[in-house]
Structures are given as structure tokens and as C-alpha cells.
């Protein structure tokens, strides 16, 4: 695989509050215990509901309980465990049309080597990759200076994350995947079967066959990972089509990230193991 140029990029979050994960009643909402000092009273449930949730959390002296928006619809079962420390972006002073005042954007995972900070914001990978392309800090194989960077562009039966053109008129499509699953220093994707992901890779193969450039970029939303692998145990079909895509000319790359409560920063490329 051809290499990217070295890059340092990042995005920032505003007004972060730390809490403890309790439960996830559905894909979009979590129950989190946070410091009452950082919360607006109108966001809390009734006293009875609060006591019931506090019993569920196992806390004798629990803080306030809030329902928060989860910015990742993946399973994340190995991350979202009761008692885990989570980071919330606070929107209480900029609600707009929001129904929930907080968004869960990150979590701390206990590993054999200590605490691993993981960004869970599924919108963040696209943003940092697009920013890198716009600034010229990422230079893609076979492409010159980019003159068009268009998000959410349709090609065939799929809508890719980014469509690009360079000054010579060369065209290409980029699909970005955020990665939050880690086991013993290896990042895996996906964490759940993804027929949509398989379809996107098939379309990237067609892009190559039609003479355009195609890139699949995995943004591993954590640091201290050694490599990235397709999760064949969870979805063998995704791994098979990914290996086929690499053989047919789709450029496949993965980057680890420096993660803090307030930021996500792409820091270095890591190997993609397709064996």
C-alpha cells in the first residue's frame, strides 16, 4: 500500500463534563450519572426514577442522572459497561432544537496496560479527514492538489463520505470508517455486522474499475494500538470484500489518534493487517 504523508490534525469540543455510564436503553440514548453542579434541573427525571437508576448504578451516593445522546449507534458493548467514566459535551447554554442537553463523545476503557481513552463520536472521523484534505496536510496517492472536496456524494447505489477532484481533473471517492473496538493492542472493524459497509466497499471497487481513485480510511479513535484488522469473527463478509478491494486497487489506510476529553487528533499511520 502506498503511504500518506505524515499529518497532525485535530478537532475540539466545547464544555466537557465527566460522568459515569449506567445504561443504554436504546442506540441513541444513555443514562449517565454526572455531577449535579454541572447540570440543569429541567433535564432530570423524577425523584423516584432517579433513586431507581441510582440503585442500578450501584452508587450509594450518586449524583444527578441525565439521559444523554449517544453519538455512536454501533454496539460498543465492550465499552459501555456500568461504571465506566464517560465524557459529555454540554449543550445547556446552546440547546437550539436539541431535546437532550448532553452528548456522549468519549469513554475510558480499562485494559491490561491501564486506562485507554476512546473517542466515540461517529461524526469526528469524517471531520478530521476532510479538514486534512482541505488544508493539504493529507496528500492522496495518484492525486495532485485538490480543487473539489464534496461530502456525501452519490456514486452508483452508494453515497460516499467524500468526493474529490484535483487540478488535473482526476477524480476519486473516499469512504471513512471510525474504529472504537480494541483487543490487546489491535483495532478491529466492524464491531457489528455491516451490510452497508460491504456495499460501500463493493462500490469502491467499481470506482477503481471505472478508472477513478478510491480510498478507504480507518480512523482508529484511540492511541497505543499496533495495527488494524477486519473483524472476521463478527462479519467475515466485510473482511473478505476488504481484502478483495485492496487487491483490486482500493487504497486502504488506518490512523491512530491522540484522544483527550476535549479533542481528537490524528497522530500516526498504523499497519492494516489483511491476513
Residue ranges and their predicted role:
Residues 138-155:
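A short acidic/basic microdomain associated with nuclease active sites
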Residues 185-195, 202-234, 256:
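Nucleic-acid nuclease catalytic cores
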Residues 26-32:
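Short aromatic-glycine-enriched beta-strand elements
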Residues 19, 160-191, 204:
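Conserved catalytic cores of phosphodiester-cleaving nucleases, focusing on short active-site segments
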Residues 6-8:
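Short, positively charged and aromatic/hydrophobic N-terminal segments
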Residues 74-87:
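Short nucleic-acid-contacting surface segments enriched for D/E, G, S/T with interspersed K/R
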Residues 63-77:
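Beta-strand/loop nucleic-acid-binding surfaces
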Residues 221-275:
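Domain-level recognition of nuclease-like catalytic cores that cleave nucleotide substrates
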